[in-house]
Amino acid sequence: MLDGLILNSHTRHLLEDYLANPAQAMLLTVPVGVGLGTIAQTLGHQLAGVSVVYLAPTLHNAQKTAIINADDIEYITGIVRDKRSDRLVIVMDDVDKTAPGVFERILKIVEEPVPNVYYLFTTHNPIAIPRTIISRSQVIDVRKPNANDCDKLLAGIDAAKRTQVKFLANRCPATMGRLINNPDDFAKAAQQMTSAKQFITGNTDFRLGLVAQFKDRADAIEFIGMLANLTEYIHKSGSIQYDTRLARNLQLISTIADRLNTNGNVKAQLLNLAVCYN
């Protein structure tokens, strides 16, 4: 049923169980790059064929940030208002990126289920989802697939680039596909990794200067992800001597990432990172 997806075996089992007995609302969570939107849409088509409505954050009017707003939910409410004999799946991708008051509207449609209508929510930032919605949803934490499964995407690529892509993507199939097919994305990711290496080896003054270059939230979050991956890699290779130091740095990175994902000030959070990382 899910043969076209590169999935962790445990995750595949959970998703197949869901398809056999679907909950009215399900929340998929995972780190960026595994391909949540693709997974959710595939599940939707397995459940309802072509009767899948896909909703994702978009720019509305003069807004600078893509979000799901009240009009989007009103549109969904209109679709599901009437009773139906066939299945309909509503996919809400990146559901954490909403306008004020929208979570209350989402909660209302989940609390008032319509027969044969199913909701698939996705998020890379589950702490931003209200407990009231989580408690009314089946939650599946999608694990990264193993490296051997990801290698299927690397056929036909020269050995040097294959090694780079595997390291940069860190077992995230969607990221891996993007790096393979888009040279600009590959170059940007490589630069982010270079910055992460320089951050780790530099002193505090150097780190402060490096993070001052990041103005865009998305770029800052991507840098944080690279820094986390590289910190873990260095530890596994034996280059970091003390586990307590590793744990402290990874906890710091995780905290900064959470704050950035919940609209924490980019400059302030990166300054905190530069000063406290050691």
For each feature predicted by the language model, list its residue ranges.
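Charged, glycine-rich active-site and insertion segments that engage polyanionic ligands
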Residues: 1-34, 39-51, 55-58, 116, ...
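Conserved alpha-helical scaffold flanking the Walker A/P-loop in AAA+ ATPase domains
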Residues: 13-18, 67-90, 97, 101-108
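Short glycine-centered, acidic/aromatic-flanked micro-motifs in structured strand/loop junctions
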Residues: 30, 92-94
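Flexible beta-alpha connector loops of hexameric P-loop NTPases
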Residues: 62-69, 95, 139
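Walker B beta-strand of ABC/ABC-like P-loop ATPase nucleotide-binding domains
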Residues: 90-91, 121
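Short catalytic-loop micro-motif centered on adjacent basic/acidic residues
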Residues: 91-92, 141
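Conserved catalytic/switch belt of AAA+ P-loop NTPases
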Residues: 97, 101-121, 131
